[in-house]
Amino acid sequence: RMSLRPVLKTLAVVAALSTAALAAPASAQQKFVTIGTGGVTGVYYAAGGAICRLVNKDRAKHGIRCSVESTGGSVFNVNTIKAGELDLGFAQSDVQYNAVKGLSQFKDGGAVADLRAVFAVHPEPFTVVARKEANIGKFEDFKGKRFNVGNPGSGTRASMEELLTAMGWKLSDFALASELKADEHGPALCDGKIDGFFYGVGHPSANIQDPTTSCGAKLVSLTGPVVDKLVADKPYYAKVSIPAGLYPNNPQATPTYGVLATVVASAKTPADTIYAVTKAVFDNFDEFKKLHPAL
């Protein structure tokens, strides 16, 4: 299981800033809330749908109607919340941390001072998948291969870039660094267009299930001194193992590292909206967990 202690340091950083959000005045005009998620086949979209289903059950009481929006992922969601165009959104805990600190993808635009953590949802192991015929034994074997690094704006892409920097690699170290979205990398792998992909996701995931079932794709471990240093240095990372036999043709456990999926909002999001969403999830937590196996 994924140890949450290192990653929860991230949430503490943001949650410590969150009390202002709860003190914000309620807005009677706020009747619709939109949650930014990810691709339609991803866990964020399913988890967002689960949240909205629970919120909408009680809409007669609180007057708030919830809907999900498919987006480019974590970085996109944070930037769109900052722009006032989303009420809430999913974000990897590393993206959330970097946004608050003004690091990495947020260095040019500056810290997102109004970003607030609402709650954490599920662990997201970084999952590396290889084409069966590519003869990949470890991540370093992808050098000179065709590899999907994730679409710009996604948390997967942000985490991939941090790993490559730590390894001293550049995108040019791959024969091809494709930028496919999560629902595209599985078919591309099975069609022989890429040799592997990197994906931060809660498990089980349809985007991993499909290529392991359809073309015998293999999960590749992410371990070694570089990963050890990343986990030691970054408060939002923790080591995790993808269980043995979770996916077809992968009977062994796959050690890796990962983050937490979190729901974030702006300090400007009305407090009654945050309360209604949080109450809907935690008053119906057993039902929430049943709405997707990754929860």
State each model region's role:
Residues 1-13:
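Bacterial N-terminal signal peptides that target proteins for export
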Residues 108-121, 126, 246-255:
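A structural signal for short loop-to-beta-strand junctions that line the ligand-binding cleft
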Residues 28-99, 107-108:
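N-terminal (or domain-start) structured segment
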Residues 22-28:
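Sec/Tat signal peptide C-region and signal peptidase I cleavage site
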Residues 11-21:
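Bacterial N-terminal signal peptides
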Residues 93, 104-105, 134, 171-270:
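Pocket-lining segment of extracytoplasmic ligand-binding domains
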Residues 252-295:
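Segments of small-molecule ligand-sensing domains
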Residues 32-58, 64, 124-191, 286:
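Bilobed "Venus flytrap"/periplasmic-binding protein-like clamshell domains
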